[in-house]
């Protein structure tokens, strides 16, 4: 074994020793940008799709969510390779499984609510439950911006749920209330997460350049 190979082997052993592959959580923030795009598309096309056909709407939403998870999975594997991690860590699997189960539950709820044309309620339920997922991500990654964003989304979704229920605003697809909830969701699940992810990427780049 050459001297260079020996040095590389020692570096790899040190890295493996320092990185707990069971609990470590490397994260590719490009996934946030992908989910932001999907959130915008889903928010805008979900209601027309379900109005066209319940089956078509459910299939379209399931397809978009599946695309999101496939892309995020590939991005996760990419960032894991930089830490010599061949598979997902336990924390990554935990978060991914939670988001996937939440998404399946949401698709079922959405289909049921769409049968009764409760479109405003559908949008708010997505905001509430996906924000719970972002709260978990913020907690695991120790990113206060994610947890604060999630708390804000949860609070505003609960407020709108109370207002919508009190004034009976959930039914229909052409109300001002629905437009308001769609705008809130686009900001809360697309604009805000993408902005936070971009900020985190810049911080990682700056810290990386400083350490060189």
Positions of the model-derived regions?
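Terminal transmembrane helical module of multi-pass membrane proteins
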Residues: 136-212
